Amino acid sequence: MASRTLDFSLDKYQELCEVLAEHYRICTVFEYLSEKPEGNIAIVRHDVDRNIKNALRMAEREHDQGIRSSYYFRYPYTFRPDVLTRIRDLGHEIGYHYEVLSKTNGNFEKAVTLFSSELEEFRKICPITTICMHGSPLSKYNNRDLWSRYDYHSYGIIGEAFLSFEQDNGDLHYLTDTGRTWSGKHSLRDVMRTAPGNGNPEILDTTDDLMGWIAQGSAKKLYLTIHPERWSSNSGEWLVWSALDFGMNLGKKILRRWHS
């Protein structure tokens, strides 16, 4: 039965965390890649594209529920040393949300140099062992293509939040809140190219749909990507982000038609 809590609110996210904790061992990207845990596993990743304060609110709620997850920050847009430190101290993983191919207009040599320098800025604050590409939907460059020419392991990185799972995902189901839905229909680059999940437009639209699907035992291994700005703390904020998501989804639809 659907909850009356407003979808894509922090209260709804707390409900989702409760369902996840009931059915899975929840882990960070680093924990999954380094420990290779067995059983019912849920990886929870946050891409902090905007609204740093909301990321901290989420991290605090997760901590109160005994959950540790991964938070990936963009440089310099969401790079706030005080917030990174606070979230790290709550027990969460901090990662680098890189977008260097987009920033350098596809110049690989400049991009890898920029990657190294931005990574060092993060490491002045806390250890960084995993990275995650930013989708940059308005750019023609796919940031993860950087690793077709270079090896992130040479920078002391054990894994990339897409590529490492595409190489060995088994029965891992990948779902993202991109576009204010769990269906995946608004994702351009936020996809796990070899995962059996990647959303299901017919059954997974709302967070209530997702929670019901989880409760049915539909996936042994689950990988969720969450964007903190999408989960509002009040009705005014919810209306603003709902309108922004509507505009972004429309823009992506135009881009798909343009490139088709």
What are these regions (language model features)?
Residues 1-45, 49-70, 84-90, 101, ...:
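Terminal accessory/targeting
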Residues 74-77, 99-102:
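Short, acidic/turn-prone active-site loops that include or flank metal/cofactor-
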Residues 79-82:
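Active-site-adjacent beta->alpha loops and helix N-cap segments on the catalytic face
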Residues 93:
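Short glycine/serine/threonine-biased micro-segments
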